[in-house]
């Protein structure tokens, strides 16, 4: 199977499909008025360590808003990697959970989704840059695009 393009029903394994999905996520972010944010996609064989984290950056961070007391700004890359850390530890969507306390280096922000496109692989997709609901919607766009034939 080609690492760049994938083949047949397994197109999502290819870098081209993953890059196309990341582009669709950034396009959706821009369409809803976001000009900052970071998207990621991880596709891995079940039971194996992650071998590739694909990501793309619309804008890495937001400066502090001096009109809001206490606003220190936001590093979207840092936030999205914290979401990914939790997702890699649990293989569940990035959501608050009463079942598992957060560890240092994790956040309970929504915006990351996990799914199994076949019996052998698991996919993690996430975005940080909007509200939690916007981040989830953008991640779902990435999932749809990733699974679409080239």
Question: Which functions belong to the PLM regions below?
Answer:
Residues 1-150:
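Flexible, solvent-exposed loop/hinge segments and secondary-structure transition points
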